Amino acid sequence: MAKIVKVIGREIIDSRGNPTVEAEVHLEGGFVGLAAAPSGASTGSREALELRDGDKSRFLGKGVLKAVSAVNNEIAQAILGKDGSAQAEIDQIMIDLDGTDNKSKFGANAILAVSLATAKAAAASKGLPLYAYIAELNGTPGVYSMPLPMMNIINGGEHADNNVDIQEFMIQPVGASTLKEALRIGAEVFHNLAKVLKSKGLNTAVGDEGGFAPNLASNADALACIKEAVEKAGYVLGKDVTLAMDCASSEFYNKENGLYEMKGEGKSFTSQEFTHYLEGLCNEYPIKSIEDGQDESDWEGFAYQTKVLGGKIQLVGDDLFVTNTKILKEGIEKGIANSILIKFNQIGSLTETLAAIKMAKDAGYTAVISHRSGETEDATIADLAVGTAAGQIKTGSMSRSDRVAKYNQLIRIEEALAAAGTPAPFNGLKEVKGQA
């Protein structure tokens, strides 16, 4: 047993220039874990609370000194002397101490940073890479897979300052046989997309997640540009590369009139009409995954969408499920969607994150591990994806170090497992619900 001997919280800066919480957990023997909480832009209303100070004189009110204070005081006092490898116990102590349904006393940003730092310190104390330790916590020791990247190469919605309503247009390099090859394909398409956009006189500045953020006439235009880029890179769309979208529909859903208002296109849709709009895009392009294709509270709309599209493509719940097992359980019972997006700051601890992944898999749903639009150099989600054999990862485009850090960690893990004589499989499109 390696006891926790020191806990340190600090305010650091994320990829959007906003503060976030970093935690250090020290164990006996000199083992240290360091982790930082990410932050979202388009957030589900039922997510665990990210505690901000609200002091307009610092960081426009976005400081996290209250959350940092919770780490350095109440949380530290509660877990000092505890066994660092008792992950579930440590997480439960923090959850109970917070005492709220949504972690609003200390902030999910405080609790998560300590939770992840504890896991990293415990992994170090056991001489294990983080992905291997996560697999042990998951009850699946030695079971790994390399995730299929869903690479966000055109950004819209809340992630970009442009007129594109759909938040993410992604490529899936399904023709690859390894993770590293998938990243090469993604990079080549990304660079060719820059050329395509420039040739059309369009902006090649990037959004929060490293994808391009041009003004386009329609969402279909974004898909057409990506198709051209895939072909210019020498690949076949639908065979080597498939497509995915994150609609983030809650961001353009008008609760007053019940319409999905796509201002960039000047179009409005009822819930069912929007499902058929997406169906039309799927018929025109090889779109294999759609995330949040309805408003988070439009469960009737999601049920209809699942009936229409759920047998053909992956329907991922992000704002819909917010990595919460209570909400996911209800969704499974009602046949809503067929996949869950996993963002550990939506729920606020590693233990609860692993529970959501397990519940999804047990129900035949897929689990897509995801970054947030506000990130740091912390690459824990790469280890989470491999250690749970989740099969898919969303961590942005082929630019911005906060995104590429995760891809580079995946390269290291793939290389290490191969060198140990236990290569992790890369299953490509087979990992996507409905595509096996």
Curated annotation (Swiss-Prot):
What subcellular locations does the record give?
Answer: Cytoplasm; Secreted; Cell surface
Residues involved in Mg(2+) binding: 246, 291, 318
Named in its record, the pathway it takes part in is: Carbohydrate degradation; glycolysis; pyruvate from D-glyceraldehyde 3-phosphate: step 4/5
CC cofactor: Mg(2+)
Q: Which residues participate in (2R)-2-phosphoglycerate binding?
A: 167, 343, 372-373, 394
The protein's annotated catalytic reaction(s) are: (2R)-2-phosphoglycerate = phosphoenolpyruvate + H2O
Alphabetic keyword roster: Cytoplasm, Glycolysis, Lyase, Magnesium, Metal-binding, Secreted
Q: Quaternary structure?
A: Component of the RNA degradosome, a multiprotein complex involved in RNA processing and mRNA degradation.
Q: Which HAMAP family match?
A: Enolase
Protein name as catalogued: Enolase
From the broadest rank down, the organism's phylogenetic lineage runs: Bacteria, Pseudomonadati, Pseudomonadota, Gammaproteobacteria, Pasteurellales
Gene for this chain: eno
